[in-house]
Amino acid sequence: MAMEARIRGWAAAGLLLAAFPPFAKAQESKRVDPVVVTATRIETPAAEVGVAVSVVTEEDFRTYHYATVDEALRSVPGLEIRRSGSLGKTTSITIRGATANQVQVLVDGVRVKSPTTGQAELSDISPDLIERIEILRGPQSALYGADAIGGVVNIITRRGTGPFSATVQQEVGNYDTLRSRVSGGGQWKILDYAFAASHLESNGQFKNDGSEARALSGRLGVALPWDSHLAFVARWNRTDTDLPVKFVCCGPLAVEPLIDVNQQQQSETLVLSLEGKTRPVPWWESRGRISRFENSMGFQDPVDPGYAFDFPAFSQINVERREAEWINAFHLGKWSTSTVGLEYRHEEGENKGVFRSRTHTQSLFFEEQLRFFGRLFLTGGFRVEDHSVFGTETTERGSLAYLIKGWGTRLRGGAGSGFRAPTLNDLFYPGFSNPALKPETSFSWEVGADQKLWQERIRLGLTYFHNDFDNLIRFVMLPVPPFVAVMNLARARTSGIEAMAEADLLKNLVGSVNYTYTDSETSGRNRPLAREPHHRWNVGLTWEPLARLSLFTQVHTASRQFEDETVGYNRGHTRVDVGGTYRALDRYGWLQAVELTARIQNLLDEGYAEVRGFPALGTQALVGVRARF
């Protein structure tokens, strides 16, 4: 019966793909390669970098009506998104088998990972004011230091341009979902400005399964002489989340969760950044930034009625990170760029009534880019990072890209080392911490090729990657108090393939597919890494049958994943999303356009859990209206 249901599901998905095609908007056949900044810390055409890089644009958010950042990242090859249940629940990201602790997440270059847990909470990042998201896969510690073993996700906010413009959007859906958003921006003389406010709430599928997220964002810039610019960015959000899954001691969570009726969490985040950049002469550009990240998280779980042996739990965790960086790039003609950077980082965390600790880090990095004949591009560099607790780490990375322009071919490859710093919890939390911990380390390499065919209407890519992880930090049981501790005692390996294809099938029809195969193994246990599927597929089509109408379909498939020795595997799943935009009104007075929007996630009502014990939502529809001024 399960097989028949899956066959019926795939058949229905096939019909939907034929009827409602998905993925990026149809464009002219001639495309311009994007310019990225995350791969080299300065603006560089993507074709000139040897690392695997993907870009999610502001246009993607408008086309697919992503309500959250994690939904926008699901279609990127090599990435795995794991949400623990419904909207607002904890959401993490892994890249090529590297855990969430080993992936660096930035907003305008500012680290937004918690110093205590070591993870970035994607549900706390609003999709407001996003111009693009650049995703680097592979080790990036030579540029970004600790916690960039698996890659970097850099969310870049939009700068105001041109006359004032604004967008107002309202959406409603099942599960009592309501989403409201307003944004605007523009430019006046030497000033540029952009702002946004949003609200997202939903009641979820269980009792005590609701969430409410509110966010404010703003960016103010000023143009200065000598090709200079100064910008101040502020982002605030608060997420109130009900947690319906009851913790069960000493065993894995059941597939069907036990409901906790009064467990709740609140998270409030503030990110502030002041950045200045200048290029007074063609051969030198300089950029400086100071920033501050704050997060306050409260957790409450009173005694549940009806349980004889239940116990209450409460916590209040406050963290702060202050950063300063200064980067200088020196250009020698068109063939050489040397980049030198200095960074300082101060981190502190407090679990009220438990512990309070702080660390500081100083870093120096150097990178050299060489360009030969407009075809061969070499990049190499290193970083020295000194941590106040565990000492100094040095990481290196090198890459190359070679263009065969007459064939539309790009060959690329690279290798590098990385490390993940122990968190404040690892080092200082009473009862299990270990101040003698060393960083997790890695060495990774990759080779790949990209091909354009049919006057660039077809775009293909293939990458092979290999990662070796050492000194992994793990919990171990002890025969004496405190009975549990963290130690450097594990090793792991991942390798695999990322393949992608995108085609402009017609002028109004674009299709894409990408596939990731990941083979992983934990040394000594002869088992794959937990929650890392062997196979992932993303399929999409976007169709514009009328000038006013755009339709899309996206299909996400993941194979089963190893959970642990007790329960074995968490089964795989296939999720189908569809939607579209209809422009109901064109220019009328101040109105630029009025659009009707729709997005339906999990159309086939697939029952699955990205994290075992935390069931994902069934079919979720969100429809609304968007007005642009």
Language-model segments: residues:
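Structural signature of Gram-negative outer-membrane beta-barrels, strongest in the C-terminal barrel
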Residues: 234, 278, 291, 333-339, ...
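Extracytoplasmic beta-strand/coil segments of soluble accessory domains associated
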Residues: 70, 74-114, 131
